């Protein structure tokens, strides 16, 4: 007989949800956020690490392969996002104090790069973005990023390569394969520092 596609269970729905999810609207979770637990956020807070939260309505476009050689011709699906005044205040204050600004995932990088001003400060934003970040790209806000190990030919991998440098990211991916790291939504992640 014909095999039916597996249906998501309530347990699947719980595991594929970030702990800070509040607003309905995303088709998929911003998967890098899945690495964070309430305990980890509390430990970060105790160490004086502030967190700013934004709303991302991630779409299925993140899973489309890049099928063009000229990356400027790749069309991104639009995604809705909201960056509040409170989030801007936390991020901009950290930046002005010389602290690191760490984006959790490529969707956050896409959102913040959409909303960063020419002065390097994050601006309030409530709208849509179809920004496609690929090498070379001059980042205006974050100086570090946590990124999952994404699949080849994906826009997510291109954004990661733009942030960490293509050669260094490809070297990290080769090591990840060699050492059996997991790729994709429930896979492993890396921290990229750009000082």
Residue map of PLM features:
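Surface-exposed, charge/polar-rich loops and edge strands
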Residues: 1-195
């Amino acid at each position: 007989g014909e095999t039916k596609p597996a249906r998501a269970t309530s347990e699947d729905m719980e595991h594929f949800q970030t702990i800070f999810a509040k607003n309905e609207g995303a088709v998929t979770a911003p998967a890098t956020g899945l690495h964070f637990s309430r305990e980890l956020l509390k430990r970060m807070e105790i160490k004086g690490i502030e967190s700013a939260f934004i709303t991302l309505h991630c779409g299925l476009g993140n899973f489309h392969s890049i099928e063009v050689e000229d990356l400027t011709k790749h069309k991104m699906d639009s995604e809705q996002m909201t960056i509040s005044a409170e989030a801007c205040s936390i991020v901009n204050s950290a930046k002005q104090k010389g602290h690191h600004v760490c984006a959790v995932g490529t969707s956050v990088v896409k959102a913040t790069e959409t909303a960063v001003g020419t002065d390097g400060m994050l601006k309030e934003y409530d709208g849509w973005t179809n920004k496609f970040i690929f090498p070379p790209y001059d980042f205006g806000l974050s100086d570090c990023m946590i990124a999952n190990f994404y699949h080849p030919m994906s826009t997510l991998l291109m954004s990661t390569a733009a942030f960490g440098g293509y050669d260094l990211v490809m070297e990290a991916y080769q090591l990840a394969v060699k050492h059996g790291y997991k790729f994709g939504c429930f896979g492993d992640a890396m921290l990229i520092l750009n000082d």
